Every structure is written in C-alpha cells, then in structure tokens.
Amino acid sequence: RLLASPQYGERWGRHWLDVAGYADSEGYADADLEREWSYAYRDYVIRAFNNNMPYDQFVTEQLAGDELVNHPYENLSEEARRKLTATGFMRMAPDGTGSSGVDQMVARNEAIADSINVMTTSLIGLTVGCARCHNHRYDPISQEDYYRLRAILAPAMDWQAWRAPSQRQI
C-alpha cells in the first residue's frame, strides 16, 4: 500500500533532491532569481521513484540524457522529454550568471565547479573541491584528475557559450 502511494516518490525523492542540491531559485545573489523550470526536474525525480526506475538508468539519464536523444529536439516523445528533463541534475548547483553586478567569468567558473561538487558528492561520495587548487589531502583525487573531470563536462558546460539561467529550459 505504501509503495503504491504517490507520496512514496515525494518522500524518498526528497532525499535525492537534497543530495542533488535542488532549489527553486539560483541561490547565488541577494536577488536569488527563480528557476522557472526547476519543478520539471523535481517531478522527474518523483516519477522515477514512483515508477521504480533502475538506479543505473536514473543516473545515466541525469548525466547524459541529452546524449540519449536524437537531434533535432523537435516533436519529442514523452521518453525523450523525460531524458532531457533529467539533465536538470547538472544545473541544480548555485548559478550566479543571471545576476547583475557579478563578474560573469568568475560566476561561470563557480557554477561549473559547484556542479562538479554536486555530481561527485552525490554519485561517488567524495568532495573534490580541494583539488581545484591542489591535490586532495585525504581522498585520492589529484588536481590533474579534477581538471580531467572538468574537461569531460566541458561540452555540456561551455563557459564561452554560456546561457544565463533565464535562457535555459533545463
């Protein structure tokens, strides 16, 4: 009875949303701009829990859902929309690039670093932020490994072709 309840996904999905840093706003500046489409990611997580989605599929869709859908993104099936929505995971970190009065290059760099931090703490249980500047003192993460990981994400989080949060639907 409890597993069949729609509240099951809300209850247990909330734990994942906490780990993913889910927020309805950017969480960066005093203005704290609203993330207009963040609810879609929240609903994706709740549905995934209610539908008993396998964990490997859950993680794959969040990290690479856009790579699982063929271009162009027109006349999308419900499955394709789900996969694209799942990539909202990569945009849950604080992002100040839509705020006025901030250095955009610094804000973009911080948004990427925060996204890496969310991804690594939630999926591998390690903090890697220290490795931005030096080899991690306690975990086996070198500075070189950190920037290798960042290079993997570069196509999805291109700081030179950055879209402000208000220009995104994910």
Regions found by a protein language model. Give the residues of each.
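Short, structured secondary-structure elements
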Residues: 1-170
